[in-house]
Structures are given as structure tokens and as C-alpha cells.
């Protein structure tokens, strides 16, 4: 009986795996951890035409980019953090680290709100932020469950 339950659950699990449709590249300033303060909203990718309208895409990206811009460190804080990095053995990076961390947290909240919008939720479209310390970059992933 247990084998019947596991075999029934397997197809349902396979169907609900999201498929990555598009990655929105970072175009703004990048912090040490790879987080960028802006993602490319200049063009609407043709891969997304079957899943969402350009207006929905633009509004979602504006929301995400605005969250990053609002909390991103100011130029003096940013400059001091990087400029004094060698002299302070990296300790100056903590000046802006709190702001970057808060920007990332706020952006995660905004992405959760974007995912709850009817235009995305009803179509099983999800947005998520991914970053790579190794590659020193980040991107937004748009996935869909078909």
C-alpha cells in the first residue's frame, strides 16, 4: 500500500517542478556579495510573451528595482566602504553592509508581493532573486509551472 502512495505522489511532484523561462540580468552597481542595485527593464523578452504582458513585467521590475534603489547605500557610504577597504583590511565594508542587507531583505519581501499578484499567481509564474558570490553577480529568475 505504501508503494501505491509513493507511485501516485511521484507524477504529481514531477508536474509541479517550475521551469525557468528567463533570467533578468543585473545592470546596476554590484556589492561584494554579488547583489546588484538594478535589473534590466529596458526590453521585454520574447520568451515571456506567452506567459505575461509587458505591462505586468514592467510593473514587477519597477517594484523590485525601486526596493533596491530605496535602500541601497548612498555614494559617500559606498565610496568609503570600497575606498578604505585595503587600509582597514575589509572592515570598512561593514559601513554599507547593513544597508545592502536591508535592501536584499526588502527586495525579497517585494518579490513575495509580486508573486502574490493575480496576474502571476493565477498563471503559476514565480520570480526569485539568485546571486553568486563566486561570479560576483545576481539575476532575477522567472519560472513557470506548466
Summary of predicted features, one role per range:
Residues 1-146:
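A composition-biased, non-transmembrane "mature-region" signal
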Amino acid at each position: 500500500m505504501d508503494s501505491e502512495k509513493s507511485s501516485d505522489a511521484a507524477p504529481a511532484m514531477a508536474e509541479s517542478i517550475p521551469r525557468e523561462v528567463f533570467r533578468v540580468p543585473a545592470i546596476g552597481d554590484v556589492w561584494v556579495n554579488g547583489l546588484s542595485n538594478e535589473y534590466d527593464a529596458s526590453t521585454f523578452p520574447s520568451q515571456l510573451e506567452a506567459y505575461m504582458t509587458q505591462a505586468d513585467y514592467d510593473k514587477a521590475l519597477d517594484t523590485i528595482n525601486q526596493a533596491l534603489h530605496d535602500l541601497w547605500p548612498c555614494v559617500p557610504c559606498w565610496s568609503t566602504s570600497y575606498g578604505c577597504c585595503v587600509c582597514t583590511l575589509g572592515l570598512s565594508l561593514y559601513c554599507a553592509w547593513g544597508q545592502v542587507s536591508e535592501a536584499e531583505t526588502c527586495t525579497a519581501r517585494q518579490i513575495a508581493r509580486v508573486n502574490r499578484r493575480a496576474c502571476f499567481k493565477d498563471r503559476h509564474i514565480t520570480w526569485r532573486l539568485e546571486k553568486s558570490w563566486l561570479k560576483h553577480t545576481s539575476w532575477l529568475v522567472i519560472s513557470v509551472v506548466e
